[in-house]
Swiss-Prot record:
UniProt organism field: Alexandromys oeconomus (Tundra vole)
Cofactor annotation comment: Binds 2 heme b groups non-covalently.
Transmembrane region(s): 33-53, 77-98, 113-133, 178-198, 226-246, 288-308, 320-340, 347-367
List of residues binding heme b b562: H83, H182
Compartments reported by the entry: Mitochondrion inner membrane
Cofactor: heme b
Record-given protein name: Cytochrome b
Length: 380
């Protein structure tokens, strides 16, 4: 078996990536989320494939076809709720994975980090288009509002929006193309994940100390395969509790009303995992400014390697920047809450304050904190 594992062209690649891979001996459970994201992607592709077998991407039958899946298809309700809540689990793992990268300075592996940002955008695009497919009220109005933001682009905006819609409003053509893109994107994401891993294995994993771990490596299997398996069990348990006991807790009740272009819901809002970005978008009165802030709220991650001023890589031994980091986490939770609230006092001013704080912490406060910590270390 050892000979095949090390000699066979295909198995050799798997061996170098998941079995004989040298890994730092001290990586904590925060390093589990990469494998959990891979699992989430697999769950989404498999459940999505079965849903696509029964779904029809036509405005007249889309809503009914989803109801048909839940009522008439064997275990269709389970497949549908695993797919819907699987998306939420995907984003929870994504946010924790990115948060880990920011905390431990993993952004210094620039190729891996930038590939991760591309993946984040791709997953967000996929999730957005997937939310449109059931063709409920929030699906329709969410698609209308978010695609309409592109009209803020000078000169080509209006033409671009009508080109994406395939007409003068979100309609049959829009739904069909969104289904096509929603189907193909996860496979593109899978290819990007392989590139992400390729870049990661060029440098090797980071670790909680932020120090070079070449002197103390252990094989990935069995140490981290068994550790990842525990994470897998916990993820599946949480997903099944969500899908079986609270299937609609993260959804919007408005999406159980078929799409009606003549009736606008009182509060248009996206799924919970987009609320922080939606709050930043809404906190700027200007349309183009809001769109730019929305894109920057994610793209700012690409600036992190440039904004790194500390002589240390991780935040493990940096209490001042640690404080900034946890304030940033709290700020993101506030933004998520604000994104789901109506546009009125006091939510507007809270959202604007939280948006300013978000960018200020990343661009100004954390780099300054890094320099202060450098000076403290130089005092002797």
């Amino acid at each position: 078996m050892t000979i095949i594992r090390k000699k066979h062209p295909l198995i050799k690649m798997i061996n170098h990536s998941f079995i004989d891979l040298p890994a730092p001996s001290n990586i904590s459970s925060w390093w589990n989320f990469g494998s959990l994201l891979g699992l989430c992607l697999m769950i989404q592709i498999i459940t999505g494939l079965f849903l696509a077998m029964h779904y029809t991407s036509d405005t007249t039958t889309a809503f009914s076809s989803v109801a048909h899946i839940c009522r008439d298809v064997n275990y269709g309700w389970l497949i549908r709720y695993m797919h819907a809540n699987g998306a939420s689990m995907f984003f929870i793992c994504l946010f924790l994975h990115v948060g880990r990268g920011v905390y431990y300075g993993s952004y210094n592996m620039i190729e891996t980090w930038n590939m991760g940002i591309v993946l984040l955008f791709a997953v967000m695009a996929t999730a957005f288009m997937g939310y449109v497919l059931p063709w409920g009220q929030m699906s329709f109005w969410g698609a209308t509002v978010i695609t309409n933001l592109l009209s803020a682009i000078p000169y080509i905006g209006t033409t671009l929006v009508e080109w994406i819609w395939g007409g003068f409003s979100v309609d049959k053509a829009t739904l069909t193309r969104f289904f096509a893109f929603h189907f193909i994107l996860p496979f593109i994401i899978t290819a990007l994940v392989l590139v992400h891993l390729l870049f990661l294995h060029e440098t090797g994993s980071n670790n909680p100390t932020g120090l070079n771990s070449d002197t103390d490596k252990i094989p990935f299997h069995p140490y981290y395969t068994i550790k990842d398996f525990l994470g897998v069990l916990i993820l599946l348990m949480v997903l099944m509790i969500l899908a079986l006991f609270f299937p609609d807790i993260l959804g919007d009740p408005d999406n159980y009303t078929p799409a009606n272009p003549l009736n606008t819901p009182p509060h248009i809002k996206p799924e919970w995992y987009f609320l922080f970005a939606y709050a930043i978008l809404r906190s700027i009165p200007n349309k183009l400014g809001g769109v730019l802030a929305l894109i920057l709220s994610i793209l700012i991650l690409a600036l992190m390697p440039l904004l790194h001023t500390s002589k240390q890589r991780a935040l493990t031994f940096r209490p001042i920047t640690q404080t900034m980091y946890w304030i940033l986490v709290a700020d993101l939770l506030v933004l998520t809450w604000i994104g789901g609230q109506p546009v009125e006092y006091p939510f507007i001013i809270i959202g604007q304050t939280a948006s300013i704080a978000y960018f200020a912490i990343i661009v100004i406060l954390m780099p300054i904190a890094g320099m202060i910590e450098n000076n403290i270390l130089n005092l002797d």
